């Protein structure tokens, strides 16, 4: 009787374990730090540098939240992010992002970058100045299931604006 009881307990535990394994295999795969960094890099490299805005839908999750700085709404979804990137590409058609540093830890990737471009289209209330500006920024991405699900952005918008609106100075004057 004792053996039968132990066998039933074993079979029950085995069935439960098998069920849990099946559930975990249908959950999203774990994203490695290397994969997360590549996904974060695509945010600027594919969408901005390669002028491929459709790539955004491949790298952000359906419920992505972007905590933005620099004059945009504080929280944006995928449509808001696409509109923001479109605004920047219209304002700076030659916009180029260079990557200064990536740091990955767990499901977070920090990107430090430098951007530069010639201001040829409206940007918020600022009309085109045809001046070139260079500014820096930092993004913190949270990546889950191979997609960006949350972003915190800080950008030197004030430094960019100063470069675009202040009178040009000539050295020695």
Annotate each PLM feature.
Residues 5, 19-173:
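C-terminal and inter-domain tail/linker signature
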Residues 6-15:
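Bacterial N-terminal signal peptides
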């Amino acid at each position: 009787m004792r053996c039968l009881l132990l066998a039933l307990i074993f079979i029950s535990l085995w069935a439960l374990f098998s069920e849990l394994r099946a559930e975990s295999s249908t959950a999203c795969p774990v994203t490695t730090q290397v994969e997360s960094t590549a996904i974060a890099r695509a945010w600027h490299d594919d969408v901005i540098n390669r002028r491929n805005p459709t790539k955004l839908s491949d790298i952000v999750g359906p419920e992505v939240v972007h905590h933005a700085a620099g004059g945009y709404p504080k929280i944006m979804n995928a449509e808001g992010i696409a509109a923001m990137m479109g605004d920047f590409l219209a304002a700076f058609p030659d916009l180029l992002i260079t990557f200064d540093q990536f740091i990955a830890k767990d499901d977070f990737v920090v990107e430090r970058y430098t951007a530069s471009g010639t201001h040829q289209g409206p940007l918020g209330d600022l009309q085109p100045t045809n001046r070139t500006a260079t500014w820096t920024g930092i993004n913190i991405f949270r990546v889950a299931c191979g997609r960006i699900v949350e972003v915190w952005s800080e950008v030197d918008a004030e430094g960019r604006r100063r470069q675009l609106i202040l009178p040009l100075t000539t050295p020695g004057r």
